[in-house]
């Protein structure tokens, strides 16, 4: 997909993605240079894994921002915060709103538990929601009355904090439904291992340019780190919260 027209920039989220129209006529949130190479890799890898895992993730793609579009200078922040070349694009859902404590109650438990386990697997601590607020990085699509999963830029976190995860994750209240049931845990282990069968295909799909911040300067994540995080699901201590 090629990006054709800039429509604005989001003021929400740490990366403040740009809003663009693609050559398919659809509108996307787009993350590029400003988000960081690590972020792009995490988004792309996690999005594909989420699809294979069965999560209701918003449609996504790798998009190309032409040099000529940046050169037009329609926004002063495009060159620094987006840049030309390959970027990560997530389709805008026109009838979606950020998940709240109220709409959280509408999410089916099986879907919520899937999200919880997936975030545990990917060490994604960035999905907070308590009665006092938070940033769940989840949307409620009012047109279809369903959940939409977005934002995995902080996945594969080397500083993942188990205590914080279990206290503030949007679906943490369902943890014991998994942790306390051996059959459920075994089913999820089987599911995760099946997803891992496509891991080399996922790796091959990552643009080579994303592995480098600059000439000779690697991105702040390695494939070995991603693979090690995901391979935890094979270990007996995968569910250990101590």
PLM region descriptions:
Residues 38, 133, 158:
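Active-site-proximal flexible loops/turns
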Residues 97-107, 130-131:
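Short, motif-level signal for alpha-helix interfacial/capping segments enriched in acidic residues
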């Amino acid at each position: 997909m090629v990006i054709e027209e800039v429509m604005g920039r989001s003021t929400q989220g740490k990366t403040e993605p740009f809003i663009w129209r693609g050559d398919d006529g659809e509108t996307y949130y787009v993350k590029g240079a400003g988000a960081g190479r690590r972020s792009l890799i995490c988004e792309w890898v996690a999005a594909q894994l989420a699809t294979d895992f069965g999560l209701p993730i918003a449609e996504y793609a790798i998009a190309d921002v032409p040099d000529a579009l940046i050169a037009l200078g329609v926004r002063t922040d495009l060159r620094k915060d987006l840049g030309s070349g390959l970027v990560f694009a997530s389709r805008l859902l026109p009838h979606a709103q950020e998940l709240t404590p109220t709409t959280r109650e509408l999410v089916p438990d099986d879907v919520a538990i899937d999200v919880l386990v997936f975030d545990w697997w990917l060490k994604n601590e960035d999905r907070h929601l308590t009665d006092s607020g938070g940033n769940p990085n989840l949307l409620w699509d009012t047109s279809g009355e369903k959940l939409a999963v977005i934002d995995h830029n902080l996945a594969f976190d080397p500083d993942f904090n188990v205590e914080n995860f279990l206290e503030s994750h949007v679906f943490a209240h369902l943890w014991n439904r998994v942790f306390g049931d051996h059959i459920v845990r075994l089913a999820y282990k089987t599911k995760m291992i099946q997803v891992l069968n496509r891991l080399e295909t996922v790796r091959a799909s990552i643009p080579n340019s994303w592995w480098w911040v600059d000439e000779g300067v690697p991105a702040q994540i390695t494939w070995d780190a991603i693979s090690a995080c995901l391979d935890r699901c094979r270990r007996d201590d995968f569910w250990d919260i101590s």
